[in-house]
Structure formats: structure tokens, C-alpha cells
Design a protein with these regions (language model features):
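Conserved nucleotide-binding/hydrolysis micro-motifs of P-loop NTPases
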Residues: 48-51, 90-94, 156-158, 179, ...
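Phosphate-binding P-loop
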Residues: 3-10
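Walker A/P-loop NTP-binding active-site region of P-loop NTPases
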Residues: 14-88, 144, 150-171
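Phosphate/Mg2+-binding loops and adjacent switch elements
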Residues: 105-238, 242-246
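Surface-exposed interaction regions enriched in Ser/Thr/Asp/Glu
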Residues: 439, 446-455
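Structural motif
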Residues: 381, 402-404, 436-438
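Short, surface-exposed loop/turn motifs with a glycine/proline- and acidic-biased composition
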Residues: 424-438
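C-terminal lobe/tail of nucleotide-utilizing enzymes
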Residues: 2-3, 188, 216-396, 405, ...
Length: 455
């Protein structure tokens, strides 16, 4: 694993949604619309299929062999003035990191009598794609980036949520398996190695753990930055709408901010069928439109009430191909948001690229963000402290809650997160929990044996 240190503030939009919702098209249209407004934009895609090249109308080459670049993507290609696009090179990234790991562990291989793998034997393992995407996110924020906006075409929502949770999870594993306090004994390693007559690998192990910890912390800062948001794409319908709700709850569990819900491939209001007015095809299409509009209405209400912009993209009657179709898509996009006077019309796909239209209108990073996961002191009233965890989209039957020492393990559908308890709550016992108004409210009762007594 190799993530890049250093960093800069760069507006970053991660585009995801259920499989087949149109993530790649939405990411490309967003990036092009932003470039048309004068921004310098880099569009990265993790899709290794033909869709990105078909949508953009350009070829995305792989990185040259052995170019030594720390950025895990191929040479960025100009799509339009101000917009460059590149494909994240998952396979090449894995082989580079595997060769690096073998080089670092050469002495251990010699000790064990093992033969390192040749370059052509190194085929990527499960988990290679998330690590390549995380490395790409970090690399794009390194130094003085020559662009104003980074748009990333991410994997489907479940994979994206697990990917965004990975740095925190891996850091926790490192701290548990290789506690920093045990590193004090490293001074004894050379003496132990002489007594044993063989090299002791623990020194290198701890050095590697320290490097990984720093690199994972760096990419976690990118994910948690105020300038990084998620854009959810959905093709409205009953099944897809429920998948978006699950994704929304999973993103909230990871403290990821959603800037826009993009409802894609919307049919016209009047669905007349050419050559079959009022016939079988017209009735079938009318039913499909009604189903889509019902799902759209419910999603609009759910997201707008939480001040999330909703952007509607029309169905072009064909699969978008090239910048002409992307320009048409962006030009016909309609967005609505919650403003100071209620629901207001927006600017389509470029809403939320410079700042929030809601409470944080001063822009990303300039406004004070209230602590979302707040602890409410209700000891004087109810004898409890209440930890409020916003989880919009969560269902009561899909929640799971386990107290383990100084941690709270929260499950929302297929997603889980281990949360360290605030110091005050560590001296309490969990006395109940309830899901109210899109937030999980966990009640803690002070433990008399641990809680400080008033004099």
C-alpha cells in the first residue's frame, strides 16, 4: 500500500449511486458543465469498461510502463477546454505496490528461502480497486493541484461506502494489532537478533505500520474534508429509490456529506408513443412514467427537507455520447434547493460546486460546521445523556447497536462503523435508543461508580 503525504484543499465531488443509475454519465456531465463555466476540472473514473470512453468520446490510455508517477492514473486527456479525464489504473497500481512490497521485504524472503514473484505473475487481488481509488484521491490533493475541481466516477454505492470507510477501519486494525506503546521495546531488537542469530522483522514491521498510519490518516483527511462531498445518482423507481435510501444512511454513518441527489433518465410528462397514440405502447409508457414520478416525488420530499439539492436530468431518448450530448444533458438539467425563502430553482449540475445553497452559504471550509454527532446533557431533566447520530434514510428494523468497552458499534443495513465514545459517555451505561426524525438517539445513564459526585 502506498498513499501520498502532503495535501491541499481541492473541491472534490464523488459520484455514486445504485448500479446502472448513470453514474458515469452524471460525473461526465457535471465535469463538463463546470469546465464550461471556466473551472479547471479533472475527471477520474474507476470504470474499466467501455462506458467512460463512449460517454466522453475520447480514448483514456493506460499509464506508460515504468513511468514512476505516484499518480495511479493514465495520462489525462483533454475532453474540452478546461476538462481533462483519466482512468484510474487499478492493475498497474497493484503491480507497482506489490513490487515495492517485495523489494522492502527482500531480506525476509531471503531468510525464509522464498522466491519473489516476477512482474508478469502479479495479478491483482480483491481489494486492489479500493486502494487504487484511495491513492488517486490522495494524489489529486498533493501539492499545488493544477485544477479547481476533482470529479470522481466511483463504483456503485455499496462499494463506495465501504471504500470511504476503509482508511478509518485499517487505522483501527493497525492500532489494535501493533499498538504504538509496544514500539518502545524496539531498542531491544538488535540485541535479540544477535541472540537468536537471525534478523528480527519486528523493527521493519513497526516502521511499515507507522508509514501506513500516516498515509491512511492523510487520505482520511481528504475524505472528511469540508470540500469533499458525495453526489448520489438514481434512476427513479421503487427498487432504486429504496437502494438510495440505504446508501444515504450508509453515507451518513460514515459522516459523508451529500451535496446533490441527481434523478436521472426522467421521461417527459406527456408520454405519447409515436405510431401508437393511446395504444398498448402508450399505456405501458404512461404506467412507467407514473411510477417514475411517484418515486421522484417521494425522493424530492425526503432530500429537500434536509436541505439536499435535487437535480433532475432528462432522458435524451438515447444513450449520451460525446460532449454534444453531455452539453444538452447539462443544459436541460433542472435543480431545486432549499433557500432562505423556501424552495428555489438552481443552476442544474453546477449547484453546490462552490458552496452550499443552504445553511453553509459562505462556501466550503469558511463556515463553522456544528457538531452533527452531538451529546445532549439531559441529566437534570431525565437523568441521561443523549448521543444524537444523524442517519437519514435508516429504518428501525435495519439498525443494530452494540456497546463494547469504550466503543459503540453501529450497524445500518449492510454497513457498520465502530465509534469511539466521547469521554463523558465512557462513564455511562447504554439505557436505550430510538430512531427519531432521521437520527439515532442513544441514551446513556451515568454509572454511579464512575461518575464524579457533586460535593
Amino acid at each position: 500500500m502506498h498513499l501520498i503525504a502532503g495535501g491541499s484543499s481541492l473541491r472534490t465531488v464523488l459520484v455514486t449511486g445504485p448500479g446502472g443509475a448513470g453514474r458515469t454519465t452524471t460525473a461526465a456531465a457535471t465535469a463538463l458543465a463546470a469546465a464550461r463555466q471556466g473551472r479547471r476540472v479533472l475527471l477520474l473514473t474507476s470504470d474499466r469498461g467501455p462506458a467512460p470512453e463512449a460517454v466522453l468520446g475520447v480514448a483514456l490510455p493506460a499509464p506508460p510502463v515504468g513511468d514512476g508517477s505516484p499518480a495511479p492514473w493514465g495520462p489525462p486527456v483533454e475532453v474540452a477546454p478546461g476538462l481533462r479525464a483519466a482512468r484510474i489504473a487499478v492493475g498497474e497500481h497493484f503491480r507497482d505496490r506489490a513490487r515495492e512490497l517485495q523489494d522492502r521485504g527482500a531480506s525476509l524472503f531471503d531468510l525464509l528461502g522464498a522466491t519473489p514473484l516476477d512482474a508478469e505473475e502479479l495479478t491483482e487481488l480483491p481489494g486492489a480497486e479500493p486502494l487504487a481509488i484511495l491513492t488517486a484521491l490522495r494524489a489529486a490533493h498533493t501539492g499545488d493541484a493544477p485544477w479547481d475541481l476533482l470529479v470522481v466516477d466511483m463504483p456503485p454505492a455499496p462499494g463506495t461506502i465501504r471504500l470511504l470507510a476503509l482508511p478509518e477501519q485499517l487505522r483501527r486494525y493497525l492500532r489494535r494489532l501493533l499498538p504504538p506503546e509496544r514500539q518502545a521495546a524496539r531498542a531491544l531488537r538488535p540485541m535479540l537478533a544477535q541472540l537468536a542469530g537471525v534478523p528480527m522483522p519486528a523493527q521493519r514491521l513497526y516502521e511499515t505500520a507507522e508509514r501506513w498510519e500516516a498515509e491512511l490518516a492523510a487520505v482520511q483527511r481528504v475524505i472528511e474534508a469540508r470540500s469533499t462531498t458525495v453526489r448520489l445518482v438514481v434512476d427513479p423507481g421503487p427498487v432504486a429509490a429504496e437502494a438510495v435510501r440505504v446508501a444515504r444512511a450508509g453515507l451518513a454513518l460514515q459522516s459523508c456529506r451529500i451535496d446533490t441527489l441527481v434523478t436521472n433518465r426522467l421521461f417527459p410528462e406527456a408520454p405519447g408513443a409515436a405510431g401508437d397514440p393511446g395504444g398498448t405502447a402508450g399505456s405501458w409508457l404512461a404506467g412507467l412514467v407514473d411510477e417514475q414520478r411517484t418515486a421522484l416525488k417521494a425522493l424530492r420530499e425526503e432530500f429537500l427537507v434536509d436541505a439536499v439539492t435535487v437535480c433532475e436530468l432528462p432522458h435524451l431518448g438515447r444513450g449520451p455520447r460525446g460532449t454534444g450530448d453531455l452539453d444538452e444533458l447539462a443544459g436541460r438539467a433542472r435543480s431545486t434547493a432549499v433557500g432562505g425563502t423556501g424552495i428555489v430553482e438552481g443552476d442544474g449540475l453546477t449547484d453546490e460546486l462552490d458552496g452550499w445553497t443552504g445553511p453553509d452559504a459562505d462556501g466550503y471550509g469558511s463556515a463553522e460546521e456544528p457538531e452533527a454527532w452531538s451529546v445532549e446533557d439531559r441529566i437534570a431533566v431525565d437523568g441521561v445523556l443523549v448521543w444524537r447520530l444523524p442517519l437519514p434514510g435508516a429504518h428501525r428494523e435495519g439498525l443494530d447497536l452494540v456497546r463494547r468497552g469504550d466503543e459503540l458499534i453501529v450497524g445500518v443495513g449492510p454497513f457498520r462503523r465502530v465509534l469511539p465514545l466521547p469521554s463523558a459517555l465512557r462513564r455511562c451505561t447504554v439505557s436505550g435508543a430510538a430512531l427519531r426524525d432521521g437520527a439515532l438517539c442513544v441514551r446513556f445513564t451515568p454509572d454511579p461508580g464512575l461518575w464524579p459526585r457533586s460535593s
